[in-house]
């Protein structure tokens, strides 16, 4: 009697377990992931006297969630990227790259659409090029005579040259009576006469 009761209880427990398990939602435990492959194209010109090397260029996904470097041919790859919207950033010495918004479609089996965030331009291929070159050092301006003339010291020297050489000639054309009356007015007001400052008036 006891074995029959045990077998009956075991069968009832098994049926209950299978029935309860069938009512739970089934999850695969992992999302569908995709691979993003792109290329970084850098001009052949040098930056700050050094050629840009692919090994020094870093590509970042979602602010550091994934980081990769370029292969010698300039390509990069991100593996196990879930469907959704992602952000790709390129860090290269001497260049500024626009961040790229990448939309990975789950409906179309990993179809990728890329858009530059700076210019809002869509990319048919994930080929990233710098928007501009960056200068980290201020370039020294070449020597220029005009820069010296326009400086405060140059303007002061020019004014002194006018006073010393041109003012005496201008004074010669002024009526002596008018000059005398002007000097008297300046003395009465406590202002020194301009002619007293000139070598010709001494």
Swiss-Prot record:
It is found in: Membrane. It comes from the Eukaryota. Keywords: Membrane, Signal, Transmembrane, Transmembrane helix. Residues 179-202 are annotated as: Disordered. SUPFAM superfamilies: Starch-binding domain-like (SSF49452). InterPro entries: Carb-bd-like_fold, EMC7, EMC7_beta_sandwich. Residues 182-202 have a biased composition (Polar residues). GO terms for molecular function: carbohydrate binding. Residues 1-23 form the signal peptide. It is a single-pass membrane protein. The chain crosses the membrane at residues 148-168. Its main location: membrane. Pfam families: EMC7_beta-sandw. GO terms for cellular component: endoplasmic reticulum; plasma membrane. Belongs to the EMC7 family. This is ER membrane protein complex subunit 7 homolog. It comes from Arabidopsis thaliana. The lineage of its organism: Eukaryota, Viridiplantae, Streptophyta, Embryophyta, Tracheophyta.
